[in-house]
Amino acid sequence: HTPDMVQGAILAFRAASNARDVNCVVFTGAGDKAFCTGGNTKEYAEYYAGNPQEYKQYMRLFNDMVTGILLCDKPVINRVNGMRIGGGQEIGMACDFSIAADTARFGQAGPKHGSAPDGGSTDFLHLFVGITRAMASCTLCEHWSAHAAVDIGLVNKIVPVLKAPDGRFIGNPMVSLERFDAWGNPAYGAFKSGTEREAAKAAMAGCTTDLSLLDAEVEAMAYKLSLTMPDCLAKTLESVRKKKLEHWQRN
């Protein structure tokens, strides 16, 4: 994300809150590679990091966007079209619902790339996955597959986006669907390695990406939300979001 993008998002969420013809907000990224992989580290290294006040300004802008999502009067669906990493993970968690491509990846990057995950993950990631997983994610920066993310409660649903040459949708072959490893540790959604990984890469070689099923699931969620009473829905969103806001406002 860049300052221009963040400023635009802040204004967009405010406008959506006030628009009577808006049923819900869908927050997504362009293309099929990533929803968001965090801040432009080159940008703030060159422009912001030389002055503490400038870095504070940079982070305040991002924080205002997260707050804008949490206070939006309309439900917010995160359409995860690819990687949701770093600041992207934090933006996504601020949303009310997450529907993801099964090729998406989730996690943090801060301690490995010169920052800290203080834009939401240190505040409320544990509300989704528990303090043990949250600590590991924030410090080790190891990523979850989309399958692991839905299994641990980080997202609502995943859908296939890879299309084989014969036109069939196939599930992401890069992840294991085994529930446990040889020692009994949870392993659902673990990334394959070694020869299994090479075989999975070969299976993907002839595939194309088609996001039509992802769009259909997002549309279905939006339709379900449209069947609720707007005022009652807004009050319910406000009440459930209090749990995230309680932790976020300590930031």
Specify the residue positions occupied by each region the protein language model found.
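Terminal peptide-recognition signature
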Residues: G8-A9, F27, N40, P75, ...
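Catalytic-core regions built around general acid/base machinery
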Residues: A12, L61-D73
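Short alpha-helical scaffolding segments that buttress acidic/His motifs in well-ordered protein cores
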Residues: S137-C138, T236-V240, N251
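Glycine- (often His-adjacent) and acidic-residue-rich active-site loop
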Residues: G29-M65, R84, K112-G114
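Crotonase-fold acyl-CoA enzyme core
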Residues: G68-P230
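Conserved CoA-thioester-binding segment of acyl-CoA-metabolizing enzymes
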Residues: H1-T28, Q53, S212
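A general structural signal for well-ordered alpha-helical segments in protein cores
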Residues: V6, F62, T122, D215, ...
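Hydrophobic alpha-helical membrane-association signature
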Residues: M5-A9, Y58-L61, I91, L214-E217
